[in-house]
C-alpha cells in the first residue's frame, strides 16, 4: 500500500510531466509527423519497412480509406480488411498443397509476430474501424493491452498508436484530425527532442549541410536543415508543374494542408484569399485534389479554423462574393520576422509548415505580401463611401438651379439652399436661441447644413446701392441668394404662372418701379431670423436701399421690400424685436405717418395670424405682413409646397395677389367705417 502512495510523489520529478521541456508546434500536421518519426521499430528491418518505405511512397501515394504510418514506412488502406502478420519464407519447401494468402502488413522476419497476428477491419454495424487480435502475443492500442480473441470491440480512432511485436504504427483517417493520447504524446515528444539535440550536435560538429540556394539572403549558420527538409524544398521547386498535369492525378502532393493553404495565400499580391479561391488554387496546382472527390475541402476548412497562423478578414464594401476572406495572421508574421532577425527560428524543429513557406517566399521575393493594404483600402473606402452621395446631391442641386430672370436690374439668381424647418412653438416668434447655425458669409461655397461661424454678417447702413453691397460682402455682383420668401414678395409674371414650381423655393421676377424706403421709416421686413437688431440699430438700418431686395411688389402704394439678409446670413436672433399681430379689427390705419408702432411687445403672433389681415396706408411702408417664423411654418407645412394665399395672376392681374386682396378689404372697411358713407346709405334707404 505504501508503494502506491510513493509512486505519484515521484512522478512530478519525471521529465515526462515537465511540459516546459516539450517542443511545441503551430501546425497539427507537423506534430503528427514528429510523433510518427519517433515510433519504435525493431533493430532488424521489417519487410513492411522495405516494401512500403517512404522513399517509394513519396511518388506513388494514392487515394485510400486510411493510412497506417510507421517510423519510416506508410501503408495505405484500400480495402475494408487489412491483415497484419508474417508471410511464409520464400525458401520454405513448396511440396505441400496448402496455400495461404499473403499478409498485407508483413512484420517479419521476427518470430514474435504470428503468421496471422491481427486484422484491421471496418465494422459496418458500428460504422467504425476496429482491431481484431489473433496472435497469442496480443497487441497494444495507445499503451493498453489487447488480448487474443477479446470479446470487446477495439475501435480505432484517427491518431491511435498500435504496437504489435515491437513495431509501432499510427492509424490515420483522411477526414478526421489525428488525436494522439496524452501519455503517448509526451513519450514521443521527449524522444523527438532528444533526436533533435543529437542531430544538431552532429550538424554543428561536422562540415554542415547548409541551406538551399534559395536562402542565400540569410546567414547559413541559422539555416541548417535536415535532409528531409531539403528534399521537401527540392520537391517544391521540381514537382509543382508536374503535379498540376492530368497524368499526375494519382500522385498525392507531399505537403500538408497548412502548407498548401500558405502557398495559395502567398500567391496573392495582397496576401488575402477567400475559401473558394483557396480551393481553386489547390485544385489548379495539384491534379490529385482536382480529381479527388473526398472531403479534402473539409480538412482545408479545419486547418483554417484551428491553425492560429490564419485569420479572417472581411471583404471590401460592394465587393462581389460571400463570406470572409483569409490571410496569414499579422501577429504570426510579426513573430516570424522577429525570429528571423534574432536568429531564433533555427532553434525550433524547422519552424512550422507556414514558417517554411514564409521563409521560401521571403527568400524569393524579398518581402511578404502586404495584407494590411487590403484593410487600409477597406477603411478608406468606408470613409469615402458616405461622402459620395452628398457630393452627388450637391451636383444635382447645381444643375437644377432656375434660370435667371431677364430684367433691366442686375440678374438676381436664387441658389437652392436646403433650409431645415424651424421647430415651431405656441408663440410663433419664440425662436430657439442658436448662434449663427448657417454660415452664408462665403457665397462662393455651396450651402452645407450645420456649419457654424463665429461672427454673424451684419448689414452696413452706409451701403446704398446693390453693387456696393455685394462687392463689399465678397458676393459676385448680380447674384443674391434667398432661401425663404415672404407672402408679399411673390410677384409673378404671366410666364412664371404656367411653370410654377411645386417646392417652396421661389424665383420671383424683378420690377423696375420699386419705390425706395423713406429715411426714418422702419419696416417689419427689416427683422428676420438671420439678424438681431435693437431699436437703435433699426433706425440705422432704415437707410438701406430697397433696390437691393430679392423681390419687390409692383404696387406703387406699398413697399413690400425685404432685405436680402436671409440669403447672406441665416441665423437665429439673440434679441427679438416685437412685431404687431394684425387683425381686421387692428389694422395699420393708426400708423399714417409712415412709422411702425410695434404694439405686440409680448410676441402674440400665433399660427392663427393670417397674411392678408390688416390694412395698408398709401404713402407708407406695408407693415401688414406676418412674422417670418409663421411664413416659414406655412412654407414647409403645405402639402404642395405653395403659398396658401396665392391665386392665378390671370384673375387679379399681374400685381401681387396678396396686395390685391388687401386693397379690396381696405375698400370694404373704408366704406363700412366711414361716417359719411354710412350717412349716404341711410339717406338712400330712407328715400
Swiss-Prot record:
Q: Does the keyword Transcription apply?
A: yes
Q: What is its main location?
A: nucleus
Report the gene knockout effect.
Forms constitutive pseudohyphae. Impairs ability to damage human epithelial or human endothelial cells in vitro.
**Regions of compositional bias (Low complexity) in chain numbering:** 389-410, 472-490, 542-563, 589-624
Gene Ontology terms, MF aspect? DNA binding; DNA-binding transcription factor activity; DNA-binding transcription factor activity, RNA polymerase II-specific; RNA polymerase II cis-regulatory region sequence-specific DNA binding
Q: Does the keyword Secreted apply?
A: no
- PROSITE patterns noted in UniProt: FHA_DOMAIN (PS50006), FORK_HEAD_1 (PS00657), FORK_HEAD_2 (PS00658), FORK_HEAD_3 (PS50039)
Give the FHA domain ranges.
82-146
Q: Which UniProt keywords apply?
A: DNA-binding, Nucleus, Transcription, Transcription regulation, Virulence
Task: Tell me the superkingdom of the source.
Answer: Eukaryota
What's one Pfam family the UniProt record gives for this protein?
A: Forkhead
- Bias-annotated ranges (Polar residues): 226-241, 411-442, 491-540, 625-659
**GO biological processes:** cell morphogenesis; DNA damage response; filamentous growth; filamentous growth of a population of unicellular organisms; negative regulation of pseudohyphal growth; regulation of transcription by RNA polymerase II
Q: Which residues bind DNA?
A: 252-350
| Short motif (Nuclear localization signal): ranges | 663-670
Q: Give me the segments passing through the membrane.
A: none
SUPFAM superfamilies recorded for this chain? SMAD/FHA domain (SSF49879), Winged helix' DNA-binding domain (SSF46785)
Instruction: Kindly list the places in or outside the cell where this protein is found, as annotated in its UniProt entry.
Output: Nucleus
Query: InterPro entries this protein is in?
Result: FHA_dom, Fork_head_dom, SMAD_FHA_dom_sf, TF_fork_head_CS_1, TF_fork_head_CS_2, WH-like_DNA-bd_sf, WH_DNA-bd_sf
According to the record, what induces this protein's expression?
Answer: Induced during host epithelium infection. Expression is positively regulated by CDC28.
Disordered, as annotated region: 1-23, 226-246, 385-449, 472-569, 584-687
Q: Which GO terms describe its cellular component?
A: nucleus
Q: Which PANTHER family match?
A: CHECKPOINT SUPPRESSOR 1-LIKE, ISOFORM A-RELATED (PTHR45881), FORK HEAD PROTEIN HOMOLOG 2 (PTHR45881:SF1)
Instruction: Outline what the protein does.
Output: Transcription factor required for the morphogenesis of true hyphal as well as yeast cells. Contributes to virulence.
Q: What is this protein called?
A: Fork-head transcriptional regulator 2
- Annotated source species: Candida albicans (strain SC5314 / ATCC MYA-2876)
Name the encoding gene, please: FKH2
